[in-house]
Design a protein with these regions (language model features):
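Structural microenvironment flanking redox-active thiols in thiol-disulfide oxidoreductases
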Residues: 71-109, 122-129
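Conserved redox-active cysteine motifs that mediate thiol-disulfide chemistry
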Residues: 53-54, 60-81
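Active-site acidic short loop of glycosyltransferases
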Residues: 53-55, 85, 111, 133
């Protein structure tokens, strides 16, 4: 489709911009491998995305200083309870600069799911760049095979999130079988 646009842009005014945008976002297409990460958890363990191969993974990028992120915490707990015992893991990736404040919130609120933090935090961190994060909260749904199913799933507070997650189980190979992507970086 992008190549077809060249016919409508004979002076090549817009094509380079569209090509750059396409190149930036193709890594997040449905079926593309999600970038792996290695992050410290609130309990001191090291967590990698590939640790959850074979499971549906709901990624929640957040900050403890963001009001919208904090409001969604209650919904996150409720959503995780609804999927308890199912083949899904909720990974909450904090982009907090202040490790102590993050750990305290995780401990005091007894936040469920996998709680990890990006050392140094912020939207300029390597993880934020690899996932092209522009803001928090940001949610992503990764299939059992480690590929993106949805880079803009329903928010934790949305009633439709439950249906969307239920419909995502077992969908990973549907998208990746038709597309030849390079191997996921580990």
């Amino acid at each position: 489709m992008l190549a077809d646009f060249r016919n409508y842009d004979p002076k090549n005014q817009y094509y380079p911009t569209l090509q750059a945008d396409f190149n930036q976002h193709k890594d997040f297409a449905i079926g593309a491998p999600a970038p792996d990460f290695k992050l410290p958890s609130a309990t001191g363990d090291t967590v990698h995305l590939h640790d959850f191969a074979g499971k549906l993974v709901y990624l929640n990028f957040w900050k403890s200083t963001n009001g919208l992120c904090l409001r969604d915490l209650a919904y996150a707990q409720e959503l995780m309870r609804k999927f308890e015992g199912k083949n899904i893991t909720f990974i909450n990736i904090a982009l907090d600069e202040n490790e102590q404040a993050w750990k305290q919130l995780v401990t005091v609120k007894k936040l469920p799911g996998v709680q990890v933090r990006v050392p140094g935090g912020g939207l300029r961190s390597m993880v934020a760049k690899e996932y092209a994060l522009q803001e928090v909260p940001t949610y992503m749904l990764v299939g059992e095979d480690g590929t993106f199913l949805n880079t803009k799933p329903k928010r934790l507070s949305s009633r439709a999130a439950v249906d969307e997650i239920n419909q995502s189980f077992g969908k990973a190979s549907t998208y990746t079988s038709a597309i030849d992507f390079p191997a996921t970086k580990k």
